[in-house]
Amino acid sequence: MTSAPWLELSRTVRFSDTDAAGVMHFQQLLGWCHQAWEESLERYGLTAGSVFPGGRREQPSVALPIVHCHADYRAPVQVGDKLLIRLKPERLDPSSFVVNSQVLLNEQLVASGCLRHVAIDANSRRRCALPDGVDRWLEASSLGRIQPL
């Protein structure tokens, strides 16, 4: 089964993404994973301002802080490499979700990352339900895969 088009994103490795050894600097990976998630939301139809604080529109009433992240590096990634970032989001419960990212070079897995988010009320900072738009994105992203209720 192929992924929905908003779950597969391309990225070319730039010189500024690399370290003195000429390979991707370790800290780039989680940034790429987050940027891919942001682009995926936009491709799905959710504007950045409707999800993230600091946009030009009204401020969202729900914040989605990252409460856990990790990354694994499997092969060197170098300047000019054309990467595919494949997202595999999963709802964990009504107030949290994880976005797993696979980074592929010529269909070979070269890295992976994980970002776990929890929904909190922007004013009280207490856990709350996911925003409707993000909830719809998660539901649409899981079509074809069985997920627990």
UniProtKB/Swiss-Prot annotation:
Pathway connected to this protein: Cofactor biosynthesis; phylloquinone biosynthesis; Quinol/quinone metabolism; 1,4-dihydroxy-2-naphthoate biosynthesis; 1,4-dihydroxy-2-naphthoate from chorismate: step 7/7
Catalysed conversion reaction: 1,4-dihydroxy-2-naphthoyl-CoA + H2O = 1,4-dihydroxy-2-naphthoate + CoA + H(+)
Keywords assigned: Hydrolase
One example GO MF annotation: 1,4-dihydroxy-2-naphthoyl-CoA thioesterase activity
Classification via InterPro entries: 4-hydroxybenzoyl-CoA_TE, DHNA_CoA_hydrolase, HotDog_dom_sf
EC class (word): hydrolase
Keyword Hydrolase: yes
Superkingdom to which the source organism belongs: Bacteria
GO biological-process terms attached to the record: phylloquinone biosynthetic process
Active site: D19
Gene3D superfamilies to which the protein is assigned, alphabetical: Hotdog Thioesterase (3.10.129.10)
EC number: 3.1.2.28
Family in the record: Belongs to the 4-hydroxybenzoyl-CoA thioesterase family. DHNA-CoA hydrolase subfamily.
PANTHER family: 4-HYDROXYBENZOYL-COA THIOESTERASE FAMILY MEMBER (PTHR31793), NOVEL THIOESTERASE SUPERFAMILY DOMAIN AND SAPOSIN A-TYPE DOMAIN CONTAINING PROTEIN (0610012H03RIK) (PTHR31793:SF27)
Function: Catalyzes the hydrolysis of 1,4-dihydroxy-2-naphthoyl-CoA (DHNA-CoA) to 1,4-dihydroxy-2-naphthoate (DHNA), a reaction involved in phylloquinone (vitamin K1) biosynthesis.
Name by which UniProt lists this protein: 1,4-dihydroxy-2-naphthoyl-CoA hydrolase
